[in-house]
From Swiss-Prot:
Organism: Edwardsiella ictaluri (strain 93-146)
Subcellular location, record wording: Cytoplasm
Subunit structure: Heptamer of 7 subunits arranged in a ring. Interacts with the chaperonin GroEL.
SUPFAM superfamilies: GroES-like (SSF50129)
Family of this protein: Belongs to the GroES chaperonin family.
One annotated GO biological process: chaperone cofactor-dependent protein refolding
UniProt function note: Together with the chaperonin GroEL, plays an essential role in assisting protein folding. The GroEL-GroES system forms a nano-cage that allows encapsulation of the non-native substrate proteins and provides a physical environment optimized to promote and accelerate protein folding. GroES binds to the apical surface of the GroEL ring, thereby capping the opening of the GroEL channel.
Protein name, entry field: Co-chaperonin GroES
Domain of life: Bacteria
Cross-referenced Gene3D superfamilies: GroES chaperonin
InterPro entries: Chaperonin_GroES, Chaperonin_GroES_sf, Chaprnonin_Cpn10_CS, GroES-like_sf
Gene of this entry: groES
Cellular component terms (Gene Ontology): cytoplasm
Lineage of source species: Bacteria, Pseudomonadati, Pseudomonadota, Gammaproteobacteria, Enterobacterales
Length: 97
């Protein structure tokens, strides 16, 4: 996949995570809801500050992240794969192993 986000944008591929109901039943597909975890597949050069400096992003390609899946997150199909385009500010956390 060839895509290069601009500025503070990040491209994330959603990861499927196993969900369980309160009763311990494993939920899959639409019953589980959409995952808010994903893998960063591309990052922009950074956020342009008011003084013209560029602040590099904290996330990097390969990071697993938890993100806010709401307004401002755009889903796109690229090479038959769905990816999410978001600002770094839509990312809530980096999952460290």
């Amino acid at each position: 996949m060839k895509i290069r986000p601009l500025h503070d944008r990040v491209i994330v591929k959603r990861k499927e995570v196993e969900s369980k109901s309160a009763g311990g039943i494993v939920l899959t597909g639409s019953a589980a809801g959409k995952s808010t975890r994903g893998e960063v597949v591309a990052v922009g050069h950074g956020r342009i500050l008011e003084n013209g400096d560029v602040k590099p992003l904290d996330v990097k390609v390969g990071d697993t992240v938890i993100f806010n899946d709401g307004y401002g997150v755009k889903a796109e199909k690229i090479d038959n794969e769905e990816v999410l385009i978001m600002s770094e500010s839509d990312i809530l956390a980096i999952v460290e192993a």
